[in-house]
């Protein structure tokens, strides 16, 4: 590999690393993991300085600038994929059943989730409203389980800002 191609590849890879760490650090900061975010920012800055100095020292080659820019975009995607895998934090899942079903909360509790339920009125009559707080890593699995029980359920999830008190199930059954 000649020196020019080596620099292009190095800039590309280093910028992917930099932006991946940057993206994860930003998400850690937003989730309140301040010490982990601070530690990752140290590595982020070291990698950033290396990547930027490589580009600035070799500005005469447009391929270096393109490698930097493309590496940046790829780094954002990689960082988001990593964050999806880590799935930090909790979500609140609100479920409105298609029909009133008193047994539905118990079926979901039997799967290992904590459920609060109440009667709701919809256009076509009574429904059941459920609120479930769970770890984000369980979101897709919970959606599938709810749909298996009530295929017509309306499901919405959101991230709570703070959590205090309440009833917690220790672990969702695999």
Swiss-Prot record:
Disulfide bonds: none annotated. The keyword Oxidoreductase does not apply. It is found in: Cell membrane. It is a multi-pass membrane protein. The chain crosses the membrane at residues 4-24, 36-56, 62-82. GO terms for cellular component: plasma membrane. The keyword Membrane applies. It holds the Pfam family DUF5698. Keywords: Cell membrane, Membrane, Transmembrane, Transmembrane helix. PANTHER family: UPF0316 PROTEIN YEBE (PTHR40060:SF1). Belongs to the UPF0316 family. HAMAP family: UPF0316. This is UPF0316 protein lwe1794. It comes from Listeria welshimeri serovar 6b (strain ATCC 35897 / DSM 20650 / CCUG 15529 / CIP 8149 / NCTC 11857 / SLCC 5334 / V8).
């Amino acid at each position: 590999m000649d020196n020019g191609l080596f620099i292009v590849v190095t800039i590309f890879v280093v910028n992917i690393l930099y932006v991946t760490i940057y993206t994860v650090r930003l998400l850690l900061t937003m989730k309140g993991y301040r010490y982990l975010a601070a530690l990752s920012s140290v590595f982020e800055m070291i990698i950033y300085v290396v990547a930027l100095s490589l580009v600035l020292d070799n500005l005469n080659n447009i391929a270096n600038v393109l490698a930097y820019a493309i590496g940046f975009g790829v780094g954002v995607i990689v960082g988001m994929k990593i964050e999806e895998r880590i799935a930090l934090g909790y979500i609140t899942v609100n479920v409105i059943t298609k029909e009133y079903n008193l047994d539905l909360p118990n079926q979901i509790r039997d799967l290992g989730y904590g459920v609060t339920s109440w009667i709701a009125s919809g256009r076509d009559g009574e429904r059941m409203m459920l609120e479930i707080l769970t770890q984000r890593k369980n979101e897709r699995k919970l959606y599938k389980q709810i749909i298996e029980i009530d295929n017509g359920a309306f499901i919405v999830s959101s991230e709570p800002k703070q959590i205090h008190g309440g009833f917690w199930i220790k672990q969702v059954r695999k």
